[in-house]
Amino acid sequence: MLDDDERHTPAQQDFRCPSEEMTVPPPRGGRRVAVVGAGMVGLATAWFLQQRGVEVEVIERREVAAGSSWGNAGWLTPALTTPLPDRSVLRYGMRAALDPTSPVYVPITLEASLWRFLAGFARHCTTRRWRRGMVAYRSVNRQALDAFDELGAGGVDAPTRPADPFLVCFARDREKQAMLDELGEIEQCGQKVGFDVLTGSEARTSAPVLTDRVTSAVRLHDQRFIDPPRYLAALAEAVRSRGAVITENSTVLGIRDDGRQVVVRTRKGDHRYDAVVIATGAWLPELGHPFGVRIPVQAGRGYSFTVPADRVPEGPIYLPTQRIACTPMGRRLRIAGMMEFRGPDEPLDRRRVHAIVNAARPFLDGVDLEDRHDEWVGSRPCTPDGLPVVGPTTSPRVFAAGGHGMWGIVLGPLTGRLLADAVVTGTVPDELRAFGPLR
């Protein structure tokens, strides 16, 4: 996943599988596959293809992890991996969404594709559709951390750290109750979540970086986190060490299926492969559209920076009302947040950085929010229904892997494992049924 997000496209169509049995012909001839995009999803797909004996080349328009994989919070939290469209998003209202200091921001624009995406997104902000999406996530959430363990056992030299503790913090009782209600709904959909409730004092004892503005917290069990740049660098090195070429700073201009192979066009010429995986994040529709991928993929941009802290917490801290995520990164604290629906290539908006600073300041003690390093914006690929876009397209040799929204890091390795199975065997795993690119 070059960046785990995608650009916009026309309205959704009903999902039609390549066949009723969810099978596609495996690539003919040899086993040479191109993966377009070198973020978490793309690199994990490459690694699992190699695990199955496939020769892989990765093509990246910038550098490894240059997109939404690099600066995100690095949370491996199946407990929180849910469809993005829900009723709480609509509570912000249009006036709040047009405010650049709001956690969810939509700049005033005449871009029709953005408004089509937002209309589709709003239609999915219902309890019924959220539950249907949650059921789709349930099976992949159960396996997500196992895929990281497989990468580690296979030589990816970067740790996943236990999130001990992982604290979801609140200033008001009603905020806590909203989270408890959501966790209850997740469990009603069949996904178990381990947690306990802390007082504000207990939360501050567990994480002294918190101020007394935190009156209560939910401590999630059995979650993890990573340092994204370090992890992605190790994953790329593991892919290279198995013989793959990762070609950076190379833009794919087009993809064509000639009936026998797939032709990938770059500025340096055409290259032939037995199959291609499009894992370009928020730019996925540009290459996927000719192969029937009509699902709008919109950049949901997130911001982050790192700051020094007198007492770096042992695990992540989440402020859900403020949409602020804090992750320990060595001696510094990465602070990330916001959701901004606009073009994936737009420059960083400093108002959004300041909005994070102002929202986080009342809750964090001993943190120098003015000493910011690594200020970053990345484009998360969001879909109207909040589900990824993973599987075969109208071509049996072209596959899509993207649209994970905020969950490209936690679901990237499992996506790679499942999609590698589909490419090699020609059979789409049951876990990917709801995520079909032709839905």
Region spans (language model):
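Glycine-rich FAD pyrophosphate-binding loop
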Residues: 51-71
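N-terminal Rossmann-like FAD-binding beta1-loop-alpha1 element of flavoenzymes
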Residues: 31-57
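A conserved beta-strand/loop element that lines the FAD pocket in flavoprotein oxidoreductases
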Residues: 240-252
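Extreme N-terminal leader/targeting segments of oxidoreductases
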Residues: 1-33, 51-52
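Rossmann-like flavin
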Residues: 115-237
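C-terminal catalytic lobe of FAD-dependent flavoproteins
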Residues: 321, 364-439
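Active-site substrate-recognition segment that forms the wall
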Residues: 72-75, 80, 84-123, 252-262, ...
